[in-house]
Amino acid sequence: MRLTQGTFSFLPDLTDEQINKQLTYIVSKGLSANVEYTDDPHPRNSYWELWGLPLFDVKDASAVMYEISSCRKAKPNYYVKVNAFDNTRGIESCVMSFIVNRPANEPGFLLQRQDFEGRTMKYSLHSYATEKPEGARY
């Protein structure tokens, strides 16, 4: 099951050339970028691990691409994403986020249903990947 999080998530994986064009756009708008990775793909897992330091005031997309390549090399079976942060007063939030690396095998999720009082059903998602210990999931 393909993980769909962030911008471009329903499109085929971006090529390095396409990623570089997006990074050029991010830099041209004066946004800060950072690279994050995780092996816990749950949709509510918003706290991914930060790769290096955030890239403030970067003027060249190749610096961000270098960090992506380094992260991919060190964490080949992890999800890796790029976030673009706008520090403009009044916005001050992530304005773009997209996945640039994913594991070769994405096992998907188990939908757990639970009967509750008054014939109510409660649902929860469980990632098959998290059945293995952290660092050995893919």
Swiss-Prot record:
Indicate whether Plastid appears among the record's keywords: yes
Q: What more is known?
A: In this alga, in contrast to plants, the small subunit is encoded in the chloroplast. The basic functional RuBisCO is composed of a large chain homodimer in a 'head-to-tail' conformation. In form I RuBisCO this homodimer is arranged in a barrel-like tetramer with the small subunits forming a tetrameric 'cap' on each end of the 'barrel'.
- What does the record note on quaternary structure? Heterohexadecamer of 8 large and 8 small subunits.
What functional role does this protein have?
RuBisCO catalyzes two reactions: the carboxylation of D-ribulose 1,5-bisphosphate, the primary event in carbon dioxide fixation, as well as the oxidative fragmentation of the pentose substrate in the photorespiration process. Both reactions occur simultaneously and in competition at the same active site. Although the small subunit is not catalytic it is essential for maximal activity.
Q: What would be the name of the gene that encodes this protein? A: rbcS
Q: To which protein family does this belong?
A: Belongs to the RuBisCO small chain family.
Write down what this protein is called: Ribulose bisphosphate carboxylase small subunit
Give UniProt keywords alphabetically.
Answer: Calvin cycle, Carbon dioxide fixation, Chloroplast, Photorespiration, Photosynthesis, Plastid
Fetch the SUPFAM superfamilies from UniProt. Answer: RuBisCO, small subunit (SSF55239)
- Give one GO molecular function term: ribulose-bisphosphate carboxylase activity
Q: Which CDD domains match?
A: RuBisCO_small
Cellular component (GO) terms are: chloroplast
Any GO BP annotation: reductive pentose-phosphate cycle
> Does Plastid appear among the keywords?
yes
One family name in Pfam for this protein:
RuBisCO_small
Major localization listed first in the record, in broad terms: plastid
Q: What is the lineage of its organism?
A: Eukaryota, Rhodophyta, Bangiophyceae, Bangiales, Bangiaceae
What parts of the sequence cross the membrane?
A: none
Cellular localization per UniProt: Plastid, Chloroplast
